[in-house]
From Swiss-Prot:
EC number(s) given by UniProt: 2.8.1.13
Enzyme class (EC, first level): transferase
Sequence segments annotated as region (Interaction with tRNA): 146-148, 315-316
Family (UniProt): Belongs to the MnmA/TRMU family.
Official protein name in the record: tRNA-specific 2-thiouridylase MnmA
Gene Ontology MF, one: tRNA binding
Disulfide bonds: 100-196
RNA-binding among keywords: yes
Chain's role: Catalyzes the 2-thiolation of uridine at the wobble position (U34) of tRNA, leading to the formation of s(2)U34.
Site keyed Interaction with tRNA: positions: 125, 348
Interaction with target base in tRNA as annotated region, ranges: 95-97
Active-site residues annotated for this sequence: 100 (nucleophile), 196 (cysteine persulfide intermediate)
Keyword tRNA processing attached: yes
Length: 365
């Protein structure tokens, strides 16, 4: 009986390397696929794709699998990067990794894998998938500190039905141990962080290449007093503290703030090009008990129940927050939290959970 084929997305990191290794050990015919999604900056010091490809080839040779290199740069620019720029231009703070997953890694990559005759695709994401009651569920990973289901909430039934997540039940520390035991040189390789196409370069420098910055006033939200000058609204996001250059100003008697309390971004007026700030982490303007989300995507294809207790992540690095869905239709949904949330950020995604099951979510308005 011939082996079933799985195409594994290899990034050059330890997670995808171990995912490929485990599938090989489980008896799959494994093909590695290295995706090249960005190509303008390959000569620059910040781009790591060359070294990543070298690492992929080394790992593939060690575990005995073939690797194909595929260029999805055109698809990436059209489906992910154009949206990224559009969102920043509109004053929001997008999360391109979410779009990259649904449009590139689990669409362009999936289509290519199927053309190669594969039954499944696999990645090194920390998440799980299971079939339950005739539907495929997206699950949180066993390692809660590394769980990446937040970034995968836009995956649909067709995508999940073809997907394997070999690291679903494995802790990161054990992934590194497996790599070390098998002699994979990427065992101690540092995790990649930040937005993939920006790499380690300064964000402001990168964005300025594509969107011309426009200076404007920084005003205090409470009374409109001018506090300074910003170098472009797109460089600032809700709750931001660093980079405002107004930290030394003493102001008394404003909600949430004392004499020396830090200043935080509390809003933007795109038409007037004004950045609004407040003093103090606990200023009421930074706390909100509800939100409206748009561009909804539900994993099962079914909307969540209204007035049912769920949990939600209004940003990636936050603990699950108890909430209810007040209203939901095809266009938007309203989510009310049990406790006010700090610095809810337009453009970021809010993702809904029922226990370990990721239900889906949308983009905060």
């Amino acid at each position: 009986m011939s082996k079933k084929t799985v195409v594994v997305g290899l990034s050059g990191g330890v997670d995808s390397s171990v995912a490929a290794l485990l599938l090989k050990q489980q008896g799959w015919n494994v093909i590695g696929l290295f995706m090249k999604n960005w190509e303008d900056d390959d000569t620059e010091e910040y781009c790591s794709s060359r070294q990543d490809l070298i690492d992929v080839m080394s790992v593939a040779d060690k575990i005995g699998i073939d690797v194909e290199v595929v260029n999805f740069a055109a698809e990436y620019r059209e489906r992910v990067f154009a949206e990224f720029l559009s969102e920043y231009q509109a004053g929001r703070t997008p999360n391109p990794d979410i779009l990259c997953n649904s449009e590139i890694k689990f669409k362009a990559f999936l289509d290519h894998a199927m053309q190669l005759g594969a039954e499944k695709i696999a990645t090194g994401h920390y998440a799980g998938v299971r079939e339950f009651d005739g539907k495929f569920q997206l699950l949180k990973a066993e390692d809660g500190t590394k769980d990446q289901s937040y970034f995968l909430y836009r995956l649909n039934q067709a995508q999940l039905s073809k997907t394997l997540f070999p690291l679903a039940d494995i802790y990161k520390r054990d992934v590194r141990k497996i790599a070390e035991a098998e002699g994979l040189h990427v065992a101690a390789k540092k995790d990649s962080t930040g937005i993939c196409f920006i790499g380690e370069r300064p964000f402001k420098d990168f964005l300025s290449r594509y969107l011309p910055p426009k200076k404007g006033e920084i005003r205090r939200l409470d009374d409109g007093k001018v506090m300074g000058e910003h170098d472009g609204l797109m460089f600032h996001t809700m709750g931001q503290r660093k980079g405002l250059h107004i930290g030394g100003i003493k102001e008394k008697g404003h909600p949430g703030g004392g004499d020396h309390d830090a200043w935080f971004v509390a809003g933007k007026d795109m038409e007037k090009n004004v950045l609004y700030v407040v003093q103090g982490h606990d200023h009421p303007a930074l706390l909100k008990g509800d939100l409206v989300a748009e561009q909804l995507s539900w994993v099962s294809g079914n909307e969540p129940h209204t007035h049912w207790v769920y949990t939600a992540k209004p940003r990636y690095r936050t603990s699950d927050q108890p909430c209810e869905v007040e209203r939901v239709d095809a266009e938007s949904c309203e989510i009310r939290f049990a406790e006010p949330q700090w610095a809810l950020t337009p453009g970021q995604s809010v993702v809904l959970y029922e226990s370990r099951v990721c239900l889906g979510g949308g983009v905060i308005r």
